[in-house]
């Protein structure tokens, strides 16, 4: 009789389940901070795999773009139809410092503006801000009925629409090129540019529902940590030494 190990008896049961490992144990959470131009700076949280070996978690977070409802950032439901994109530029401990990356309308709001019996005017322009951000601005407007108008429709002539579109582009170029990105964000929230377009085009055509529909970031300047910290109200991280008086002399010890 052969003496040895019985392979059939030593085999374990088939179909044993593997040990389930929770994937969240390998991840860590970070707080997203919005720029100080918004009312609420606490945007939310995001997660990423923990730093292991040469792989740093901060490298995977930089450049990440998050989309937030403007109503949450401003604490008002009046802005619920707008979405803001924020880009992570710096990681400080567990905080992610973000910068403005774009703004857009929600689909349902945009669809609700388009109606029958009126003309649609759209314009877009590529502008550089005073701090060298290249943006593409999209504006939208609709014709409205004049006072004491009997006719049902408010269609406009093509020549009038071209004049309005030209005026819209001029105003967008003027308003954007003379301000920084942070100042532009402050203008976009209360619809300052839309009201300026409405005032300037009254002599050409009466308009309604004038909005900056979308702002898209095309190019950004070289990253500057000091300006980002100033945008978040945290000051500069540069260490400055104290000025030494002219009569200062090193103390020489006679004995050690």
From Swiss-Prot:
GO terms for biological process: translation. GO terms for molecular function: structural constituent of ribosome. It is found in: Cytoplasm. The keyword Ribonucleoprotein applies. The keyword rRNA-binding does not apply. Keywords: Acetylation, Cytoplasm, Ribonucleoprotein, Ribosomal protein. The modification N-acetylalanine is found at residue 2. InterPro entries: Ribosomal_eS1, Ribosomal_eS1_CS, Ribosomal_eS1_euk. Pfam families: Ribosomal_S3Ae (PF01015). GO terms for cellular component: cytosolic small ribosomal subunit. PANTHER family: 40S RIBOSOMAL PROTEIN S3A (PTHR11830). Component of the small ribosomal subunit. Mature ribosomes consist of a small (40S) and a large (60S) subunit. The 40S subunit contains about 33 different proteins and 1 molecule of RNA (18S). The 60S subunit contains about 49 different proteins and 3 molecules of RNA (25S, 5.8S and 5S). HAMAP family: Ribosomal_eS1_euk. Belongs to the eukaryotic ribosomal protein eS1 family. This is Small ribosomal subunit protein eS1A.
């Amino acid at each position: 009789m052969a003496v040895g190990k019985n392979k059939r008896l030593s085999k374990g049961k088939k179909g044993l389940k593997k040990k389930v490992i929770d994937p969240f144990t390998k991840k860590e959470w970070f707080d997203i901070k919005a720029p100080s131009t918004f009312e609420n700076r606490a945007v939310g949280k995001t997660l990423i795999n923990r730093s292991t070996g040469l792989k740093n978690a901060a490298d995977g977070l930089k450049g990440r773009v998050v989309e937030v409802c403007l109503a949450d950032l401003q604490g008002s439901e009046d802005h619920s139809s707008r979405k803001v994109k924020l880009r992570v530029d710096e990681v400080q401990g567990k905080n992610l410092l973000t910068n403005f990356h774009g703004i857009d309308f929600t689909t349902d709001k945009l669809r609700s503006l388009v109606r029958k019996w009126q003309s649609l005017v759209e314009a877009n322009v590529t502008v550089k801000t005073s701090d060298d951000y290249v943006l593409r601005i999209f504006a939208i407007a609709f014709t409205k009925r004049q006072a004491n108008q009997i006719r049902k429709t408010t269609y406009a002539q093509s020549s009038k629409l071209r004049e309005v579109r030209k005026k819209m582009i001029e105003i967008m170029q003027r308003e954007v090129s003379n301000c920084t990105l942070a100042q532009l964000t402050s203008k976009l929230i209360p619809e300052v540019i839309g009201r300026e377009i409405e005032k300037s085009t009254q002599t050409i055509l009466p308009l309604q529902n004038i909005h900056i529909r979308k702002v898209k970031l095309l190019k950004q300047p070289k990253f500057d940590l000091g300006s980002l910290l100033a945008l978040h109200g945290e000051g500069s991280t540069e260490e400055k030494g104290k000025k030494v008086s002219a009569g200062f002399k090193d103390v020489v010890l006679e004995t050690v």
